[in-house]
């Protein structure tokens, strides 16, 4: 099971480096939940940060790394779960012309919602 973290400064007053350092400390505290990788995403203008410690199960490639951006870069997700029918949904998305860059169920969820 992965470890996830997030924070929001509703007034967007926290500097980006502070957001990043705080979220990095949060995911470091749950390193044991995801030994494969750890990443942080920061949107300083919106006062938000997401982080994840990854336990790679479905897509073992770097393409499955999180936090993950949608193809149009509008959305970001960090997700801990498993979508059992993600291959079926992925085929539907591809048939509808949606770009897919990985074999990750997280990307399927993200692009289905984007």
Segments the model singles out, each with a brief description of its role:
Residues 1-114:
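N-terminus-centric sequence/structural signature that marks the extreme N-terminus
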